[in-house]
Amino acid sequence: MAVSARPARAPRGPDKVKKDKAAQTSGPRQGSQMGKLLGFEWTDVSSWERLVTLLNRPTDPASLAVFRFLFGLMMVLDIPQERGLSSLDRRYLDGLEVCRFPLLDALQPLPLDWMYLVYTIMFLGALGMMLGLCYRISCVLFLLPYWYVFLLDKTSWNNHSYLYGLLAFQLTFVDAHHYWSVDGLLRARKRNAHVPLWNYAVLRGQIFIVYFIAGIKKLDADWVEGYSMEYLSRHWLFSPFKLVLSEEMTSLLVVHWCGLLLDLSAGFLLFFDASRPIGFVFVSYFHCMNSQLFSIGMFPYVMLASSPLFCSPEWPRKLVAHCPKKLQELLPLRTAPQPSTSCMYKRSRARGSQKPGLRHQLSTAFTLLYLLEQLFLPYSHFLTQGYNNWTNGLYGYSWDMMVHSRSHQHVKITYRDGRTGELGYLNPGVFTQSRRWKDHADMLKQYATCLSRLLPKYNVTEPQIYFDIWVSINDRFQQRIFDPRVDIVQAAWSPFQRTPWLQPLLMDLSPWRTKLQEIKSSLDNHTEVVFIADFPGLHLENFVSEDLGNTSIQLLQGEVTVELVAEQKNQTLQEGEKMQLPAGEYHKVYTVSSSPSCYMYIYVNTTEVALEQDLAYLQELKEKVENGSETGPLPPELQPLLEGEVKGGPEPTPLVQTFLRRQQRLQEIERRRNAPFYERFVRFLLRKLFIFRRSFLMTCISLRNLALGRPSLEQLAQEVTYANLRPFEPAGEPSPVNTDSSNPNPPEPDSHPVHSEF
């Protein structure tokens, strides 16, 4: 599969150099159909010795070196951004009371200045990897800090960050510095030398697994039926498809089905020579789209850089051969590679054939074991059952990319003083820098344990912590994910046993999604709906905001009793029945049926509707005055409508101020949308420049602190203020709310107010 490589050969051209004899006899016999298709014969894998010979066959190092350079460059760019160097002081500020989520509780961050040193070592390692300078050492200098930072925070885990660590691990063992490297300039033995075929096989196999396993995971019914990413088709990138398809069909056919087919076929398309051009077109288009659809850092570009690994290894030499001769002097060598001790070469019959050495056998075993391990890990969740929730395993190493989308409607954290019995509530996410803990039992256990250590500082002794978390996955009902009656501080949790306080996903209710969509589509623009499913014996305590002047609850399945707390009244609802809920009051919904209940809140934000009507009136009045159809004078408090801003005179009403702010915001959006390409590109570069500038300055400050000691707090404050300046951005340019592109948990959109009062 991953060993399709032709024997190394020099490119054709006027400066062609003959191959060395060893290389001439090292290639596979490609006379048969199998040899032409796969690059090796059946006899090459018919025994262990022949397999070792095949995987250690001399191969051109050119393509491997190009990937090394590009991957190192991507990591140099990634460290200040997604790895978080630019915002390191916000994450690991000394003395900060924060709950962290490492893989192992014993793994803790170093003091802030030392964390900057760790990131500096990682950055220098990535730079050395890119240049091929002290290559092995550079790979280790990048690899160890990378995995330390990665394992330090489970909330930032994702598939591509895991992939970076795997690729860096592989590059540590392969000979990617045998071409186009500083090491090659300094050591003639390393310069332009063959690499064994397994160097390509392990990298190709890894990329193939990423694509193929991602495709297999997308065979999930939710993905095939179009529920996983149903809102993605609203993006402007899918506008061409919506010329011939509806938005729903674009989501189903283009986003979901084409995404499934691409992941399943991408590895095969890239592997075979005949289909590789088609594969290049599809995967390049796919990754370019992903770079615009998602905030996933360097991942699309790393995958684009990995695609040429499937080409003939000598393709860079062919590219150099077509460059002008004056430019060729600055580019990598075109000459044929020299022999390397890492490879096995065929000798003449008279002298016999070379026997595999221990080094060759170990490298072959490493390749096979590594690829088998990568095939096993995505399906190893039966071993680590404690990390299984509604989806299997810790998110990041299963390649189930974008298969599950979640929305959190309601999160309540209750604490009880173990001595006094006093109850209280915590703001969800207090003492954390993330929100991913809501979906994972292992993180919830860590969070509860951390809260139990912090709350005694606030006069809460022996705290008991209870979580009531409502989640919808792939457009299902909102339902509880954990039992709200269990004290998580004392609850049992093991990485190798099923979590007993995890509530099951109500898969039997999945067919309701079609009906739920029909209900949504039947409502007008001002009416909102929230669908709830709850377990027998549990109840939901809720508060209806005073802004929601028209709120009702309707039962879809099962039986519930609704208690109006202030009125001390109860009403039981049967299937299809509905009742009005008073605004500004608490109520409780008890599930009294023997099976899960399903109901929905239907509400209208009357305050928002009235505001929209008033703003529409002001907009209409403004247009009438501007076109001359309104001849009467405006009251003084409405004069800012024409001027666009407040310029003395009577203070405008709050409504007018709201209208002016909305107008300014809409004008700014329109200006940015219609800005020329160069202006948007410059804005993009300035934002990136700020990230790299702040990363550099804060690193210098911390390294100075380690070397010379910390200065006074006043001087430190001045230095940090200078690092936070944006000297390159034009005046009046609004700064983004959060410049930390490393944050894997951006703020959630506002939840429906029916369930967000806690």
Curated annotation (Swiss-Prot):
Residues 1-34, 726-758 are annotated as: Disordered. The chain crosses the membrane at residues 61-81, 114-134, 137-157, 293-313, 362-382. Residues 23-33 have a biased composition (Polar residues). The gene is GGCX. Its EC number is 4.1.1.90. Mediates the vitamin K-dependent carboxylation of glutamate residues to calcium-binding gamma-carboxyglutamate (Gla) residues with the concomitant conversion of the reduced hydroquinone form of vitamin K to vitamin K epoxide. Catalyzes gamma-carboxylation of various proteins, such as blood coagulation factors (F2, F7, F9 and F10), osteocalcin (BGLAP) or matrix Gla protein (MGP). It is found in: Endoplasmic reticulum membrane. The lineage of its organism: Eukaryota, Metazoa, Chordata, Craniata, Vertebrata. Residues 2-60, 135-136, 314-361 are cytoplasmic. It comes from Ovis aries (Sheep). The vitamin K-dependent protein substrates of carboxylase have usually a propeptide that binds to a high-affinity site on the carboxylase. CO(2), O(2) and reduced vitamin K are cosubstrates. GO terms for molecular function: gamma-glutamyl carboxylase activity; vitamin binding. It is an enzyme of class 4 (lyase). Keywords: Acetylation, Disulfide bond, Endoplasmic reticulum, Lyase, Membrane, Transmembrane, Transmembrane helix. Residues 82-113, 158-292, 383-758 are lumenal. This is Vitamin K-dependent gamma-carboxylase. It catalyses: 4-carboxy-L-glutamyl-[protein] + 2,3-epoxyphylloquinone + H2O + H(+) = phylloquinol + L-glutamyl-[protein] + CO2 + O2. Pfam families: HTTM, VKGC_lumenal_dom. Disulfide bonds join 99-450. Monomer. May interact with CALU.
